[in-house]
């Protein structure tokens, strides 16, 4: 594989694969009895929650994603994830300016296939401590390696390696904000009602140093009926915008059913519509077999404190009586 194609891989990874693997939003403790922080994404009460998604790009299926949580002896979580993208059209996810520089490679490789694996370590207080992801082009030695850690004083250290390129940065993470981006699918969002609003500070250590943070404004606006698991389900629609007004289309949207499960997440990237459509719990249970031998891919990464064997997962429904994921809520 030519070196320019590695650049394509990095760009594609930045827009899609790491949007899934590079974690989502930090939650405050929602209410007594609710898992704290990041744990609220992956547990239902005391039960870990496997979640699977079908990935759609411009209304075409291009892959699937899976996450599976495992509780540790100290009350924390290890979350393993897998993402597969098949025949992904490069011209729909790479910026036009980048296509100018990789035109010949793009003509020879109009679509790429990627497989990504990820791990996260979350402590008993719901704080993210480590994240690792590895993106591989099947049948090649080309890969993208991303890893990071967050210390007790909120210092974030992130490193990225791909195609002989190495990038590393460390920054201070403000309290009660998100790390990653709003494009990552969120499994649960309980406690919604029409008109509810809140703000979500988005912080990414990979963004330019002069502007590492952005504020998004979320609002529950309207309802829509979706077909899910052979049933018609009425969902609340959550819109995310860069400002308070509704003069521009939302940057991303979520469809949330009454029990708090997110059934669909949609965002627009470079004019292309990216959707994560939730799979039924039974499908997620079946897909969890993809994580067998998952940790063997991370022999070059620092170890995570986790048991060697994955537990049997529960598909207990989510009860939604708590507040949505947010840093600031306006009642």
Task: Tell me what each language-model feature is.
Residues 2-154, 160-169, 191-331:
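Acidic, serine/threonine-rich low-complexity disordered tracts
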Residues 172-199:
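Beta-strand/loop-rich accessory regions of lumenal/periplasmic or secreted enzymes
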């Amino acid at each position: 594989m030519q070196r320019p194609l590695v650049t394509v891989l990095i760009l594609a990874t930045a827009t899609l694969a790491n949007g899934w693997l590079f974690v989502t939003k930090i939650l405050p403790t929602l209410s007594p009895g609710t898992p704290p922080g990041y744990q609220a994404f992956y547990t239902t009460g005391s039960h870990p929650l496997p979640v699977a998604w079908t990935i759609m790009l411009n209304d075409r299926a291009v892959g699937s994603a899976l996450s599976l949580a495992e509780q540790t002896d100290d009350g924390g979580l290890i979350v393993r994830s897998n993402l597969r993208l098949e025949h992904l059209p490069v011209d729909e996810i790479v910026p036009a300016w980048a296509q100018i520089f990789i035109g010949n490679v793009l003509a020879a490789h109009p679509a790429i296939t990627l497989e990504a694996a990820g791990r996260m370590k979350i402590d008993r207080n719901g704080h993210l401590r480590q994240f690792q992801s590895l993106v591989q082009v099947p049948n090649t030695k080309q890969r993208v390696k991303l890893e990071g850690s967050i210390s007790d004083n909120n210092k974030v250290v992130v490193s990225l390696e791909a195609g002989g390129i190495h990038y590393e940065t460390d920054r201070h993470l403000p309290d009660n904000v998100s790390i990653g981006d709003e494009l990552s699918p969120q499994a649960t969002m309980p406690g919604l009602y029409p008109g509810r609003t809140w703000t979500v500070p988005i912080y990414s250590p990979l963004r330019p140093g002069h502007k590492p943070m952005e504020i998004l404004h979320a609002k529950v606006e309207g309802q829509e009926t979706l077909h899910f698991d052979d049933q018609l389900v009425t969902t609340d629609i959550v819109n995310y915008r860069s400002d308070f007004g509704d003069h521009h289309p939302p940057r991303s949207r979520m469809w949330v059913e009454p029990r708090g499960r997110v059934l669909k997440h949609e965002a627009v990237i470079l004019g292309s519509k990216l959707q994560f459509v939730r799979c039924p719990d039974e499908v997620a249970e079946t897909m969890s077999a993809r994580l067998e031998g998952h940790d063997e891919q991370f022999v070059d990464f620092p170890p995570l404190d986790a048991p060697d064997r994955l537990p049997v997962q529960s598909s207990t429904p989510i009860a939604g009586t708590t507040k949505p994921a947010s840093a600031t809520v306006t009642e």
